[in-house]
A protein has these predicted regions:
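Conserved alpha-helix/loop element of class I SAM-dependent methyltransferases that forms part
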Residues: 106-125
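Conserved beta-strand signature within the Rossmann-like core of class I S-adenosyl-L-methionine
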Residues: 227-237
């Protein structure tokens, strides 16, 4: 993830964005795998038999059938069966769609949302952790900017809806989601979730918690951020203002983007955008 200074002084990215060809291959793969998962085993076997017959008819005994050839042939049959668009036609629609997906209002997000100001800083495959049902729309916006997004919520229905729309919008290639209780630090089996460039928190998940439990969960999320990582606290909960959480971020610095937006627009709710220290205070 680029710093604000890097964005101001250079438009050069450290990582190249995905090419349209890569996005097209992901589009095909998602549709093919979705179709395979939607049909029964018998139908899948019949599809395999059809692919084998087609290969044998066209090969004239020139090669031995292999698993790779069979899989490729099955995939081609599925592409034909689903009438998936060729690259040239797909690209025209994709460019328009992706341009729309990268705007906050496409997802019903306020243009003054604290995350919006950070979008120019996001690079392909930056890792983002989004926590809470009230932050669900942020998952789509981040995925549209090619971030690798992990979504956590304690509501199974919400997680399933996000997963479904990610697939519908062709944004699921770098997306993961988990259902977990958010009343304490994350469970041990989620210890692999760490090193995030960006964490987006719906403070609604902290509503009703004791001050001690609230602090434990926030500190746990802080530890999962890389040095210099960003935390965005959304103004999504009427019951819990983001500013109430500010004392839990001792040593973290407010980002300039939100300061400027606050000066430009004094009305309406504001969130918090905070940057983790690049080194512990005692070694600074």
């Amino acid at each position: 993830m680029l710093s604000a200074t890097e964005v101001r002084h250079s438009h050069r990215r450290r990582r190249s964005p995905y090419s349209d060809k890569q996005h097209y291959q992901e589009y095909l793969l998602q549709r093919i795998e979705g179709y395979k998962n939607s049909i029964g085993r018998d139908e899948l076997l019949r599809l395999g038999d059809e692919a084998a017959s087609e290969l044998q008819a066209t090969s004239e005994g020139q090669f031995v059938l292999t698993e790779v050839l069979m899989l490729e042939s099955v995939d081609r049959l599925i592409v034909k069966r689903l009438s998936l668009r060729p690259y040239s036609r797909w690209r025209k629609q994709f460019l328009r769609l992706r341009a729309a997906q990268r705007t906050p209002n496409h997802w019903g997000i306020d243009a003054l949302c604290p995350l919006s100001a950070l979008l120019p800083r996001i690079e392909p495959e930056d890792s983002a952790l989004v926590v809470g049902t009230g932050a669900a729309p942020m998952t789509f916006l981040l995925a549209a900017h090619d971030a690798a997004v992990t979504f956590l919520a304690d509501n199974l229905g919400c997680v399933e809806r996000v997963e479904s729309r990610m697939a519908e919008e062709a944004l699921a290639s770098l997306f993961e989601s988990y259902v977990t209780q958010l009343e304490h630090p994350l469970p041990l089996f989620m210890s692999f979730l760490k090193g995030f460039d960006l964490v987006v928190l719906d403070p609604g998940v902290l509503k009703g918690m004791s001050a001690a439990n609230r602090g434990e969960l926030v500190r746990d999320l802080q530890q999962r951020s890389r040095p210099g990582g960003i935390h965005v606290i959304l103004p999504s909960s009427k019951a819990l203002s983001p500013n109430i959480l500010r004392p839990l971020y001792e040593g973290w610095t407010p980002e300039e983007e939100l300061k400027r937006r606050r000066r430009a627009d004094s009305k309406g709710p504001h969130g918090l955008v905070l940057c983790k220290p690049t080194c512990p205070p005692d070694t600074a």
